[in-house]
Curated annotation (Swiss-Prot):
GO terms for biological process: photosynthesis, light reaction. It comes from Coreopsis petrophiloides. This is NAD(P)H-quinone oxidoreductase subunit I, chloroplastic. Keywords: 4Fe-4S, Chloroplast, Iron, Iron-sulfur, Membrane, Metal-binding, NAD, NADP, Plastid, Plastoquinone, Quinone, Repeat, Thylakoid, Translocase. Signal peptide: none annotated. It holds the Pfam family Fer4_10.
Amino acid sequence: MFPMVTEFMNYGQQTVRAARYIGQGFMITLSHANRLPVTIQYPYEKLITSERFRGRIHFEFDKCIACEVCVRVCPIDLPVVDWQLETDIRKKRLVNYSIDFGICIFCGNCVEYCPTNCLSMTEEYELSTYDRHELNYNQIALGRLPMSIIDDYTIRTILNLPERKT
């Protein structure tokens, strides 16, 4: 008779434990009901990037001294710097500068170590194209500043991000 009583008690304890686990899961589900949605309607709503966001690289041709520091600090030797030596003034003259964003890992080393600050990171992150070769930007394409998300009247910016509890 005692084994039947202990089995019945174990069954009761397991039932209470299962009900408690179901209740805890239900409370977690209900706590998420009042939160803001994490997803956004992408083409029409965009998040404002942080101050230190590493987006597309902006290049200022006039500031570059063709020192090739950006090539040396790049982990994949990505920037292509073509220059000619001006013999009369004994200085390098920059001819061409290009970066292939299909290969770039956006580490930011080139921007950080540039002695003349001719490289900077922008907030542009939309680099999708149908042709891979369009991701190879020369000095003209790198020199264009992207339109700021805040200034674009057709896009609603999301300022208040839902806070995450860690």
